[in-house]
């Protein structure tokens, strides 16, 4: 195989996107959500992993957290990995990391990325399904379960446990 053949082969491979987010909670266990201005529903702080620059999912979650809410935090363990099929885009592998607990000073320090976000709020577990649409809602609930029961990373497909 020549170099050109190999390049053509690589270009022909299926495309998969990667996203990463941080799951932050307050002392009451409420989850920090952000409201994007470019789509319906709410989300965790996070976004697309810039894999073309060599960024890893963990680095992407930390970078996006800093960009979106102004907090630069070392992230904890990987809570969930979710393979998500979506309309009008390639599949995405979504990583959720433990962002840890936010105290009052952390909450006061939040500065939204106004070009992408409208607002933020803390949401109780029982209210998450009305804020987080589709697989994202299931993913966040599964990540909270991992934190609560101390189990290892959960594997998901479209927000549902597998294996």
Model segments located where?
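Short loop/turn segments immediately following the C-termini of beta-strands
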Residues: 36
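Acidic, metal-coordinating catalytic segment for phosphate/diphosphate chemistry
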Residues: 1-21
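Unchanged
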Residues: 49-74, 82-136, 162
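A short gly/proline-enriched turn/hairpin at secondary-structure junctions
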Residues: 43-46
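Hydrophobic "anchor" residues
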Residues: 30-31
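Charged phosphate-binding loop/patch that engages nucleotide di/tri-phosphates or the phosphate backbone
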Residues: 142-163
């Amino acid at each position: 195989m020549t170099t050109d053949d190999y390049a053509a082969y690589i270009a022909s491979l299926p495309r998969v996107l990667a996203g990463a987010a941080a799951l932050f909670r307050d002392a009451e266990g409420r989850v920090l959500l952000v409201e994007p201005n470019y789509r319906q529903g709410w989300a965790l702080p996070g976004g697309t992993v810039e894999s073309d620059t060599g960024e890893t999912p963990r680095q992407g979650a930390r970078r996006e957290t800093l960009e979106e809410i102004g907090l630069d935090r070392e992230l904890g363990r990987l809570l969930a990995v979710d393979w998500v099929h979506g309309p009008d885009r390639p599949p995405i592998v979504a990583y959720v990391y433990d962002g840890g607990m936010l105290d009052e000073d952390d909450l006061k320090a939040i500065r939204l990325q106004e070009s992408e976000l409208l607002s933020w709020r803390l949401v109780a577990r029982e209210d998450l399904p009305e804020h987080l649409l589709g697989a994202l809602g299931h993913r966040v609930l599964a990540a909270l379960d991992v934190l609560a029961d101390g189990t290892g990373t959960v594997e998901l497909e479209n927000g549902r446990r597998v294996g």
